[in-house]
Amino acid sequence: MKHIFEPLCKSPRAVILDTDMGPDCDDVGALVCLIDYAKTYGFPILGICNCTSNKAGNGTIDAVCRHCGVETPYLGQWRGEGFMDDPACHKYNDAVAETFSEAYRNGTLTVADEVTFYRTLLANAEDDRVMIITIGMFNNLAALLSSRPDDISPLTGMELVKTKVNCMVSMAATLPEGRECNIISDYESAKAVFEEWPTPIYLSDFHVGWQVMSGYDHIQDPAVIESHPLAMSYHYYTRDWTHLPRKGMNSSYDLTAIQFAVEGVGETYSLLDPVDLEFYAAIPERPELEDATRAVPDPAGKFIFMKKNVPDEVIGESLNAILRKY
Protein backbone atom coordinates (compact mmCIF):
# COMPACT_ATOMS: atom_id res chain seq x y z
CA MET A 1 0.00 0.00 0.00
CA LYS A 2 1.78 3.11 -1.24
CA HIS A 3 1.16 6.20 0.85
CA ILE A 4 3.11 9.35 1.60
CA PHE A 5 2.51 10.45 5.18
CA GLU A 6 1.53 14.10 5.38
CA PRO A 7 1.91 15.41 8.95
CA LEU A 8 -0.64 17.80 10.37
CA CYS A 9 1.92 20.59 10.54
CA LYS A 10 2.07 20.60 6.73
CA SER A 11 -1.38 19.32 5.81
CA PRO A 12 -3.82 20.42 8.53
CA ARG A 13 -6.47 17.75 8.15
CA ALA A 14 -9.28 17.41 10.65
CA VAL A 15 -8.51 15.13 13.59
CA ILE A 16 -10.60 12.66 15.57
CA LEU A 17 -8.99 11.41 18.78
CA ASP A 18 -9.92 8.02 20.26
CA THR A 19 -8.70 7.63 23.85
CA ASP A 20 -8.95 5.36 26.88
CA MET A 21 -8.91 8.33 29.26
CA GLY A 22 -8.47 6.79 32.72
CA PRO A 23 -6.39 3.60 32.85
CA ASP A 24 -3.20 5.66 32.39
CA CYS A 25 -2.50 9.38 32.74
CA ASP A 26 -0.52 9.81 29.53
CA ASP A 27 -3.84 10.26 27.70
CA VAL A 28 -4.10 13.57 29.55
CA GLY A 29 -0.67 14.62 28.34
CA ALA A 30 -1.46 13.48 24.82
CA LEU A 31 -4.64 15.56 24.75
CA VAL A 32 -2.74 18.61 26.02
CA CYS A 33 -0.18 18.18 23.23
CA LEU A 34 -2.89 17.75 20.60
CA ILE A 35 -4.67 20.91 21.75
CA ASP A 36 -1.44 22.90 21.72
CA TYR A 37 -0.47 21.63 18.27
CA ALA A 38 -3.96 22.45 16.96
CA LYS A 39 -3.54 26.03 18.18
CA THR A 40 -0.13 26.25 16.51
CA TYR A 41 -0.96 24.70 13.14
CA GLY A 42 -4.65 25.47 12.80
CA PHE A 43 -6.09 22.00 12.28
CA PRO A 44 -9.54 21.29 13.76
CA ILE A 45 -10.20 18.64 16.40
CA LEU A 46 -13.58 17.35 15.24
CA GLY A 47 -14.23 15.21 18.29
CA ILE A 48 -12.88 13.00 21.04
CA CYS A 49 -14.23 9.50 21.68
CA ASN A 50 -13.74 7.60 24.94
CA CYS A 51 -13.29 3.88 24.24
CA THR A 52 -13.92 2.86 27.88
CA SER A 53 -17.09 2.59 29.96
CA ASN A 54 -15.57 5.01 32.45
CA LYS A 55 -17.82 8.09 32.44
CA ALA A 56 -15.35 10.10 34.52
CA GLY A 57 -13.09 9.93 31.48
CA ASN A 58 -15.55 12.21 29.67
CA GLY A 59 -15.42 14.72 32.50
CA THR A 60 -11.63 14.56 32.45
CA ILE A 61 -11.59 15.33 28.72
CA ASP A 62 -13.85 18.32 29.36
CA ALA A 63 -11.65 19.50 32.24
CA VAL A 64 -8.45 19.25 30.18
CA CYS A 65 -9.93 21.09 27.21
CA ARG A 66 -11.22 23.94 29.35
CA HIS A 67 -7.97 24.20 31.32
CA CYS A 68 -6.13 24.54 28.01
CA GLY A 69 -8.45 27.32 26.89
CA VAL A 70 -10.51 25.56 24.22
CA GLU A 71 -14.13 24.54 23.96
CA THR A 72 -14.70 20.85 24.45
CA PRO A 73 -15.42 19.32 21.02
CA TYR A 74 -18.08 16.75 20.17
CA LEU A 75 -17.71 13.83 22.58
CA GLY A 76 -18.44 10.15 22.15
CA GLN A 77 -18.15 7.05 24.32
CA TRP A 78 -18.31 3.29 24.04
CA ARG A 79 -21.90 2.29 24.83
CA GLY A 80 -21.02 -0.98 26.56
CA GLU A 81 -20.68 -1.42 30.31
CA GLY A 82 -17.80 -2.66 32.42
CA PHE A 83 -14.95 -2.07 29.97
CA MET A 84 -11.82 -0.60 31.56
CA ASP A 85 -13.97 0.65 34.43
CA ASP A 86 -12.54 -1.14 37.47
CA PRO A 87 -11.01 0.77 40.43
CA ALA A 88 -7.53 0.64 38.86
CA CYS A 89 -8.91 2.75 36.00
CA HIS A 90 -10.16 5.47 38.36
CA LYS A 91 -6.93 6.60 40.00
CA TYR A 92 -7.26 10.20 38.87
CA ASN A 93 -10.20 10.83 36.59
CA ASP A 94 -12.95 10.78 39.23
CA ALA A 95 -11.19 13.56 41.13
CA VAL A 96 -10.34 15.55 38.02
CA ALA A 97 -13.84 15.30 36.55
CA GLU A 98 -15.60 16.15 39.81
CA THR A 99 -13.27 19.04 40.62
CA PHE A 100 -12.80 20.69 37.24
CA SER A 101 -15.74 19.81 34.96
CA GLU A 102 -18.91 21.66 35.90
CA ALA A 103 -20.85 19.94 33.11
CA TYR A 104 -19.82 16.53 34.44
CA ARG A 105 -20.81 17.47 38.00
CA ASN A 106 -24.25 18.75 37.05
CA GLY A 107 -25.00 16.05 34.48
CA THR A 108 -25.14 18.30 31.42
CA LEU A 109 -22.08 16.97 29.59
CA THR A 110 -23.42 15.68 26.27
CA VAL A 111 -21.85 12.45 25.00
CA ALA A 112 -22.92 10.45 21.94
CA ASP A 113 -22.56 6.70 21.58
CA GLU A 114 -19.53 5.61 19.58
CA VAL A 115 -21.35 4.73 16.35
CA THR A 116 -23.37 7.95 16.27
CA PHE A 117 -20.20 9.88 17.08
CA TYR A 118 -18.11 8.48 14.25
CA ARG A 119 -20.84 8.30 11.63
CA THR A 120 -21.89 11.90 12.31
CA LEU A 121 -18.38 13.33 12.14
CA LEU A 122 -17.33 11.35 9.08
CA ALA A 123 -20.56 11.95 7.18
CA ASN A 124 -20.03 15.70 7.54
CA ALA A 125 -16.28 15.71 6.86
CA GLU A 126 -14.55 16.48 3.58
CA ASP A 127 -13.39 13.49 1.56
CA ASP A 128 -9.89 12.24 2.43
CA ARG A 129 -9.44 15.03 4.99
CA VAL A 130 -9.65 13.18 8.32
CA MET A 131 -6.82 11.72 10.37
CA ILE A 132 -7.90 9.39 13.16
CA ILE A 133 -5.48 9.16 16.08
CA THR A 134 -5.98 6.29 18.51
CA ILE A 135 -4.33 6.15 21.92
CA GLY A 136 -6.56 3.46 23.38
CA MET A 137 -8.30 0.26 22.41
CA PHE A 138 -10.05 -0.39 19.10
CA ASN A 139 -13.61 -1.30 20.13
CA ASN A 140 -15.07 2.03 18.97
CA LEU A 141 -13.54 1.65 15.52
CA ALA A 142 -14.64 -1.97 15.24
CA ALA A 143 -18.19 -0.79 15.90
CA LEU A 144 -17.81 1.92 13.26
CA LEU A 145 -16.57 -0.51 10.61
CA SER A 146 -19.51 -2.86 11.20
CA SER A 147 -22.13 -0.08 11.19
CA ARG A 148 -24.83 -0.06 8.53
CA PRO A 149 -26.44 2.80 6.57
CA ASP A 150 -28.80 4.89 8.67
CA ASP A 151 -30.40 8.32 8.94
CA ILE A 152 -26.95 9.86 9.39
CA SER A 153 -25.46 8.49 6.15
CA PRO A 154 -26.42 6.09 3.35
CA LEU A 155 -22.87 4.69 3.53
CA THR A 156 -21.68 1.79 5.65
CA GLY A 157 -19.02 2.41 8.25
CA MET A 158 -16.40 0.88 5.98
CA GLU A 159 -17.49 3.12 3.11
CA LEU A 160 -17.32 6.19 5.33
CA VAL A 161 -13.77 5.35 6.37
CA LYS A 162 -12.70 4.69 2.78
CA THR A 163 -14.20 7.99 1.64
CA LYS A 164 -13.33 10.33 4.49
CA VAL A 165 -10.22 9.04 6.28
CA ASN A 166 -6.74 9.63 4.90
CA CYS A 167 -4.84 7.57 7.46
CA MET A 168 -4.75 6.44 11.07
CA VAL A 169 -1.98 7.01 13.62
CA SER A 170 -2.07 4.67 16.62
CA MET A 171 -0.21 3.95 19.81
CA ALA A 172 -0.32 0.16 19.64
CA ALA A 173 1.65 -3.09 19.28
CA THR A 174 5.29 -3.82 20.00
CA LEU A 175 8.22 -4.69 17.76
CA PRO A 176 9.10 -7.21 16.54
CA GLU A 177 6.49 -9.25 18.40
CA GLY A 178 4.71 -9.41 21.71
CA ARG A 179 1.72 -8.28 23.72
CA GLU A 180 0.66 -4.65 24.14
CA CYS A 181 -2.18 -3.27 26.27
CA ASN A 182 -4.18 -1.43 23.63
CA ILE A 183 -4.40 -4.63 21.62
CA ILE A 184 -4.78 -7.33 24.26
CA SER A 185 -7.42 -5.42 26.27
CA ASP A 186 -9.86 -6.12 23.42
CA TYR A 187 -7.97 -8.44 21.14
CA GLU A 188 -10.83 -9.31 18.81
CA SER A 189 -11.69 -5.66 18.14
CA ALA A 190 -8.05 -4.84 17.44
CA LYS A 191 -7.78 -7.83 15.11
CA ALA A 192 -10.95 -6.84 13.24
CA VAL A 193 -9.86 -3.23 12.81
CA PHE A 194 -6.29 -4.02 11.80
CA GLU A 195 -7.38 -6.63 9.28
CA GLU A 196 -10.23 -4.63 7.73
CA TRP A 197 -9.06 -1.01 7.99
CA PRO A 198 -8.72 0.36 4.44
CA THR A 199 -6.09 3.09 4.98
CA PRO A 200 -2.45 3.02 6.07
CA ILE A 201 -1.89 2.71 9.83
CA TYR A 202 1.15 4.42 11.35
CA LEU A 203 2.19 2.91 14.67
CA SER A 204 4.01 4.27 17.69
CA ASP A 205 4.77 0.96 19.36
CA PHE A 206 5.29 0.32 23.08
CA HIS A 207 9.03 0.89 22.99
CA VAL A 208 8.83 4.32 21.33
CA GLY A 209 7.33 6.09 24.33
CA TRP A 210 8.20 3.69 27.15
CA GLN A 211 11.35 5.42 28.39
CA VAL A 212 10.42 8.92 27.29
CA MET A 213 9.43 10.56 30.58
CA SER A 214 7.08 13.52 30.67
CA GLY A 215 4.70 15.14 33.09
CA TYR A 216 4.46 17.48 36.04
CA ASP A 217 7.18 16.65 38.55
CA HIS A 218 8.10 20.36 38.56
CA ILE A 219 4.91 20.85 40.57
CA GLN A 220 5.18 19.33 44.06
CA ASP A 221 3.18 21.76 46.21
CA PRO A 222 0.00 19.86 47.26
CA ALA A 223 -2.10 23.01 47.08
CA VAL A 224 -1.02 23.64 43.50
CA ILE A 225 -1.64 20.02 42.53
CA GLU A 226 -5.19 20.20 43.89
CA SER A 227 -5.90 23.30 41.79
CA HIS A 228 -4.35 22.05 38.54
CA PRO A 229 -6.16 19.29 36.58
CA LEU A 230 -3.10 18.25 34.59
CA ALA A 231 -0.79 18.01 37.58
CA MET A 232 -3.54 16.29 39.56
CA SER A 233 -3.89 13.65 36.83
CA TYR A 234 -0.20 12.79 36.82
CA HIS A 235 0.32 12.99 40.58
CA TYR A 236 -2.78 10.99 41.50
CA TYR A 237 -1.88 8.32 38.96
CA THR A 238 1.72 7.97 40.17
CA ARG A 239 1.36 8.68 43.89
CA ASP A 240 1.54 5.01 44.92
CA TRP A 241 4.58 4.26 42.76
CA THR A 242 7.69 3.53 44.80
CA HIS A 243 10.21 3.66 41.96
CA LEU A 244 9.91 7.39 41.28
CA PRO A 245 12.03 9.80 43.32
CA ARG A 246 9.61 12.59 42.40
CA LYS A 247 5.96 11.89 41.62
CA GLY A 248 4.21 13.27 38.58
CA MET A 249 6.14 11.74 35.68
CA ASN A 250 5.08 8.90 33.41
CA SER A 251 6.02 7.18 30.17
CA SER A 252 4.95 8.99 26.99
CA TYR A 253 3.37 6.13 25.04
CA ASP A 254 0.46 8.22 23.76
CA LEU A 255 2.31 11.51 23.47
CA THR A 256 4.77 10.16 20.90
CA ALA A 257 1.87 9.14 18.65
CA ILE A 258 0.48 12.67 18.83
CA GLN A 259 3.90 14.19 18.21
CA PHE A 260 4.49 12.05 15.13
CA ALA A 261 1.00 12.72 13.77
CA VAL A 262 1.74 16.43 13.84
CA GLU A 263 5.47 16.65 13.12
CA GLY A 264 5.91 13.59 10.90
CA VAL A 265 9.24 12.39 9.54
CA GLY A 266 12.14 14.64 10.43
CA GLU A 267 14.74 15.18 13.10
CA THR A 268 12.84 13.29 15.81
CA TYR A 269 11.19 10.38 13.97
CA SER A 270 11.54 8.32 10.83
CA LEU A 271 9.51 5.44 9.43
CA LEU A 272 10.46 1.79 9.07
CA ASP A 273 9.59 -0.31 6.03
CA PRO A 274 5.95 -1.44 5.71
CA VAL A 275 4.90 -4.66 7.41
CA ASP A 276 1.88 -6.84 7.88
CA LEU A 277 0.74 -7.47 11.44
CA GLU A 278 0.14 -11.12 12.27
CA PHE A 279 -2.37 -11.87 15.02
CA TYR A 280 -2.33 -14.98 17.22
CA ALA A 281 1.45 -14.93 16.88
CA ALA A 282 3.22 -17.53 18.98
CA ILE A 283 5.88 -16.40 21.45
CA PRO A 284 8.31 -19.32 21.84
CA GLU A 285 9.11 -18.61 25.49
CA ARG A 286 5.43 -18.10 26.43
CA PRO A 287 3.40 -20.65 24.44
CA GLU A 288 0.36 -20.18 26.69
CA LEU A 289 -0.12 -16.60 25.48
CA GLU A 290 -2.39 -16.45 22.45
CA ASP A 291 -2.88 -12.71 22.07
CA ALA A 292 0.47 -11.53 20.76
CA THR A 293 1.15 -9.85 17.43
CA ARG A 294 4.15 -10.12 15.13
CA ALA A 295 5.37 -7.70 12.48
CA VAL A 296 6.05 -9.53 9.21
CA PRO A 297 7.99 -7.72 6.43
CA ASP A 298 5.69 -6.93 3.52
CA PRO A 299 6.42 -4.21 0.92
CA ALA A 300 2.67 -3.95 0.33
CA GLY A 301 1.82 -3.89 4.03
CA LYS A 302 -0.39 -1.14 5.42
CA PHE A 303 1.37 -0.95 8.81
CA ILE A 304 4.29 1.45 9.13
CA PHE A 305 6.08 1.69 12.47
CA MET A 306 7.82 4.79 13.76
CA LYS A 307 11.48 4.88 14.71
CA LYS A 308 13.15 7.36 17.09
CA ASN A 309 16.10 9.32 15.73
CA VAL A 310 17.08 11.14 18.93
CA PRO A 311 17.59 10.13 22.58
CA ASP A 312 14.59 9.65 24.86
CA GLU A 313 15.66 12.63 26.96
CA VAL A 314 15.48 14.94 23.95
CA ILE A 315 11.95 13.82 23.11
CA GLY A 316 10.95 14.15 26.76
CA GLU A 317 12.22 17.71 26.89
CA SER A 318 10.24 18.66 23.80
CA LEU A 319 7.05 17.13 25.20
CA ASN A 320 7.52 18.73 28.61
CA ALA A 321 7.98 22.10 26.93
CA ILE A 322 4.43 21.71 25.60
CA LEU A 323 2.85 20.25 28.73
CA ARG A 324 4.25 22.90 31.01
CA LYS A 325 2.76 25.78 29.06
CA TYR A 326 -0.52 24.92 30.79
Map each language-model feature to its residues.
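Active-site histidine-anchored catalytic micro-motif
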Residues: 3-59, 104-211, 216
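Metal-dependent C-N hydrolase catalytic cores
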Residues: 1-12, 17, 56-125, 306-311, ...
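Residues in well-ordered beta-strands of folded domains
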Residues: 76, 169, 259
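Short, surface-exposed amphipathic charged segments that create phosphate/polyanion-binding patches used
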Residues: 87-98, 180-185, 218-220
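Charged, glycine/proline-rich intrinsically disordered loops and linkers
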Residues: 89-100, 150-154, 283-294
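Short, mixed-charge aromatic SLiMs
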Residues: 54-62, 166-170, 174-176, 276-298
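Intrinsically disordered, low-complexity boundary segments flanking structured domains
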Residues: 61-64, 154-158, 245, 290-292
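Conformational coupling and interaction surfaces
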Residues: 2-13, 33-44, 184-195, 199-326
